């Protein structure tokens, strides 16, 4: 009888411990799902370097990370992080990039006019391209353009091949871009005399698509 009572008490304990483990697993899974949906930004790590500092006791090593962050729709930023571990350096770079967000004027997936940017020894030339061309650019410049949401462009590096210089030269070029309305207002001319007809047509089409998407979202949200 003693053995039976001992066995009867052991079964509930086993079930309770198993249920507690399953519940703990469900809680962890739910928390991980929330963390995975934290950010919708595009992030590109362009370069990671190991640097050292000579001190009295020897050398201290750390890592630097050059990171590009953008929303893929005209907003982009560049960050440079430094830490003792690679993940921490990337995280610092992402945080700095988000603090330095700026808007890139785009029409139909390309830039508004040719522009050349310079930073230190880096020189980057950007030219608009017709739809379907794609992003014709090197690795460092491509990361900036893709995160900014540029789909068609011709880019060429005319100076240093250093990734940091190329990235900052590309950013300098993008910050020099102007909208056709700004140029027309400064010159006192109608916008048709400043921007090509094809560019204005592409802008009207993109605005129509954006307005249709907004109306569709409002309609779907209003339905019960």
Swiss-Prot record:
Matches recorded under Pfam families: Ribosomal_S5 (PF00333), Ribosomal_S5_C (PF03719)
UniProt xrefs under PROSITE patterns: RIBOSOMAL_S5, S5_DSRBD
Annotated Basic and acidic residues bias: 13-38
Gene Ontology biological-process annotations: translation
Keyword Cell cycle: no
Domain of life: Bacteria
Gene3D superfamilies: 3.30.160.20, 3.30.230.10
Keywords: Ribonucleoprotein, Ribosomal protein, RNA-binding, rRNA-binding
Location of the S5 DRBM domain: 41-104
Ribosomal protein is among the record's keywords: yes
Region (Disordered): 1-38
InterPro entries the UniProt entry points to: Ribosomal_Su5_D2-typ_SF, Ribosomal_uS5, Ribosomal_uS5_bac-type, Ribosomal_uS5_C, Ribosomal_uS5_N, Ribosomal_uS5_N_CS, Ribsml_uS5_D2-typ_fold_subgr
Coiled-coil portions: none
GO cellular component, one term: small ribosomal subunit
Transmembrane regions listed in the UniProt entry: none
Function: With S4 and S12 plays an important role in translational accuracy.
Family: Belongs to the universal ribosomal protein uS5 family.
Free-text note on domains in this protein's UniProt record: The N-terminal domain interacts with the head of the 30S subunit; the C-terminal domain interacts with the body and contacts protein S4. The interaction surface between S4 and S5 is involved in control of translational fidelity.
PANTHER family tied to this protein: MITOCHONDRIAL RIBOSOMAL PROTEIN S5
Subunit relationships: Part of the 30S ribosomal subunit. Contacts proteins S4 and S8.
Protein name in the entry: Small ribosomal subunit protein uS5
The encoding gene: rpsE
């Amino acid at each position: 009888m003693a053995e039976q009572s001992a066995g009867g008490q052991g079964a509930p304990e086993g079930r309770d411990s198993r249920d507690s483990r399953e519940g703990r697993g469900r809680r962890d899974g739910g928390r991980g799902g929330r963390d995975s949906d934290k950010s919708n930004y595009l992030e590109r790590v362009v370069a990671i370097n190991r640097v050292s500092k000579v001190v009295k006791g020897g050398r201290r090593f750390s890592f630097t990370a050059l990171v590009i962050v953008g929303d893929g729709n005209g907003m982009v930023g560049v960050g440079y992080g430094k830490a003792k571990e690679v993940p921490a350096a990337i995280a610092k770079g992402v945080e700095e990039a988000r603090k330095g967000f700026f808007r890139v004027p785009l029409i139909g997936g390309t830039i508004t006019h040719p522009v050349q940017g310079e930073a230190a020894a880096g020189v980057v030339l950007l030219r608009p391209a017709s739809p379907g061309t794609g992003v014709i650019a090197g690795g460092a410049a491509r990361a900036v353009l893709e995160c900014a949401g540029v789909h068609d462009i011709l880019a060429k590096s005319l100076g240093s091949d250093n990734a940091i210089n190329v990235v900052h030269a590309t950013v300098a070029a993008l910050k020099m871009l102007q909208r056709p309305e700004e140029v027309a207002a400064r010159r006192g001319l109608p916008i048709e005399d400043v921007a090509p007809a094809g560019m204005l047509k592409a802008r009207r089409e993109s605005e129509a698509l954006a307005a249709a998407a907004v109306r569709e979202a409002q309609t779907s949200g209003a339905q019960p």
